[in-house]
Swiss-Prot record:
Disulfide bonds: none annotated. It comes from the Bacteria. The keyword 4Fe-4S does not apply. This is Large ribosomal subunit protein uL16. It comes from Prochlorococcus marinus (strain MIT 9313). Binds 23S rRNA and is also seen to make contacts with the A and possibly P site tRNAs. GO terms for biological process: translation.
Length: 158
């Protein structure tokens, strides 16, 4: 499973997930991708489960790129512990995901759109957030960018 080799600080605060992904929101390596539609945390176990599901379906047909990395430690306290006595120990690692972020990419000579779509569908079931399948031709930079760019102002005239 994925985790950082070494970190400057062992423990982090939880933080907030606001806005959309401004980086990592376009297809860079393959022809097909899985794009996040909402924000959330994806653990290293979920990333690994998705990767396995896709790899087993495409067998040796193509190449899969993982575009996210779990770099945030999540701490937990032991069960039935009294309040106080500091923050718990790091238990697992998560990747913070914002809408529009590309999670996985797939490409290769033997990968058709149908094969890629089915492999990504199997990976979607392993993830805790809504995602959508996109190709190079129909990619969008932002998850909600299918709305019109400028909405005319509605004024109330009496």
């Amino acid at each position: 499973m994925l985790s950082p080799k070494r970190v400057k600080f062992r423990k982090q605060q939880r933080g907030r997930m606001r806005g959309v992904a401004t980086r990592g929101n376009t297809i860079a390596f393959g022809e097909f991708a899985l794009q996040a539609q909402e924000c959330g945390w994806i653990t290293s176990r979920q990333i690994e489960a998705s990767r396995r599901a896709m790899t087993r379906y495409v067998k040796r047909g193509g190449k899969i790129w993982i575009r996210i990395f779990p770099d945030k430690p999540v701490t937990m306290r032991p069960a039935e512990t009294r309040m106080g006595s500091g923050k718990g120990n790091p238990e697992f690692w998560v990747a913070v995901i914002k809408p529009g972020r590309i999670l996985f990419e797939m490409g290769g000579a033997e990968i058709t759109e149908d094969i890629a779509k089915e492999a990504m569908r199997l990976a979607q079931y392993k993830l805790p957030i809504k995602t959508k399948f996109i190709g190079l031709d129909d990619q969008e930079k932002v998850a909600g960018s299918d709305k019109p760019a400028s909405v005319p102002a509605i004024t109330a005239e009496s």
